[in-house]
């Protein structure tokens, strides 16, 4: 991110319920989360901008581009196989490598605080397992994992981390409307070769007219942490026309 910020004004956001952002009890559907970002960019004075999202940021980035196309110049989305309900979802019974990447979604959707009761106090077990099975051969550095374990040890942060999944049904209904109008701006799908690979880009083709794909070798789900130089190169090339037109300049 510091390298990308040499050429662009970079706004790094913790989405609602995550990291250092507020953790309300509701408002975790993709439309509301996208609206949060538009409101933030209004405050910062950015009328038009490019969007980069990873994992849940893929879902939010798609919603942001679909709901507010006049604001988004181009969008790069990494490491899921398409927006829920737009791209075909994996079936319930899948081979182990796919199951490793999706099992947490129905688990995280369970309400009545069951997930919090099962995971609370065991954040290192739950999230450590996720980091390991989705990380490919490289995994995540211990200090990065510890940072996330500490964040999720806050009960409100843990609850907030499940919020997007518990609003999945609302987001699915929203995406039924979104997919009726394909995105017109350029879209880049980024996949880790040991994770979703080409499916990160393929999953956006039902939702957009201009989709490019990049697969980053020797990486699992955590492409930015595992291959920062390759990720930077992919983003810099994709964002170059935006910069040349005066967008995002420092």
What are these regions (language model features)?
Residues 11, 18-52, 56-215, 224, ...:
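Flexible "cap/lid" subdomain of the alpha/beta-hydrolase fold that forms the substrate-access gate
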Residues 219-232:
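Catalytic histidine-centered segment of alpha/beta-hydrolase-like enzymes
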Residues 1-9:
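Short amphipathic alpha-helix adjacent to the substrate-entry channel of hydrolases
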């Amino acid at each position: 991110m510091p390298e990308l910020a040499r050429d662009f004004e970079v706004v790094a956001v913790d989405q609602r319920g995550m990291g250092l952002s507020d953790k309300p009890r509701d408002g975790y559907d993709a439309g509301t989360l996208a609206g949060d970002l538009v409101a933030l960019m209004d405050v910062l004075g950015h009328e038009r901008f490019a969007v980069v999202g990873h994992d849940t940021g893929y879902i939010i980035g798609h919603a942001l581009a679909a709901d507010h196309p006049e604001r988004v110049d181009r969008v790069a989305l990494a490491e899921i196989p398409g927006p829920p309900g737009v791209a075909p979802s994996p079936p319930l019974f899948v081979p182990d490598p796919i199951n490793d990447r999706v099992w947490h979604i129905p688990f995280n959707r369970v309400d009545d605080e069951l997930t919090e009761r099962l995971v609370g106090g065991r954040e290192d077990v739950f999230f450590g397992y996720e980091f390991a099975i989705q990380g490919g051969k490289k995994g995540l550095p211990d200090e990065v994992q510890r940072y996330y374990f500490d964040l999720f040890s806050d009960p409100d942060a843990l609850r907030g981390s499940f919020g997007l999944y518990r609003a999945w049904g609302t987001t699915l209904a929203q995406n039924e409307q979104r997919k009726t109008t394909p995105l017109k701006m350029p879209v880049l799908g980024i996949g880790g070769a040991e994770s979703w690979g080409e499916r990160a880009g393929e999953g956006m083709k039902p939702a957009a007219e201009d989709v490019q794909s990049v697969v980053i070798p020797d990486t699992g789900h955590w492409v930015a942490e595992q291959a920062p130089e390759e990720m930077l190169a992919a983003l810099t090339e994709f964002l170059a026309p935006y910069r040349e037109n005066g967008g995002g300049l420092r």
